Amino acid sequence: FSGIAQVIAAGTVLSDVYLYLGIGLLLTGFAFKVALAPFHMWSPDVYQGAPTTITGFLCTAPKAAGFGAVLKVFMIAFPETFTQWQDLFWVLAALTMTVGNISALVQSNVKRMLAFSSVSHAGYIVIGILVQDMAGISAVLFYLVVYSIMNLGAFAILSMAENDEQDLTFRQFRGLASRNPLLSAAMAIFMVSLAGFPPTAGFIAKYGLFSAAIAKGYIWLVVIAVLNTLVSFYYY
């Protein structure tokens, strides 16, 4: 990757057209992998159709690996082309956050709701990638750890509390607090953290991302992210 960066910096690329075409294809592939809008439509169906334990894995490990690859490729191989792709990342972040949260609002299936929630979190993570410094990298890595723990916990509880794999609706979880107070309390903690309520780890993770972005001048993107976070409070 550093060799690619050296070639680009030296201006010895054979064709800028091929360079930007390659970057575009890479970005499209990564966007599909980590479920960025508008490449996210596979995730709700897959999350709903897969066994709950498998869904917990799908929404964490592949996403963390995908964003790790994005960080390495775009921060090590293509730092010289940052001005060309930063606006596209800005749009992807805003679109992904908004589409994910609005779509999650209207879901009746718990796993589909968490799928669109996962989409919105991908949008938040892109903000950290835009920062392009150590503060952004640290914020992204911490966010991925917190996000993974919260989602693994939430899906573990779903797998223990569910009655029907094919129709895991909110109605099935009515009265969970009286039937199993411990599971109910744990689920509430995970949801509150995913929403970003203080003083949870989710709040600390979002605060780190937003602070790093503000320091780099992405104020309007942070405003959009905060508004989306407020929207997410409703469905969580």
Predicted regions and their residues:
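Alpha-helical transmembrane segments of multi-pass membrane proteins predominantly involved
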Residues: 1-236
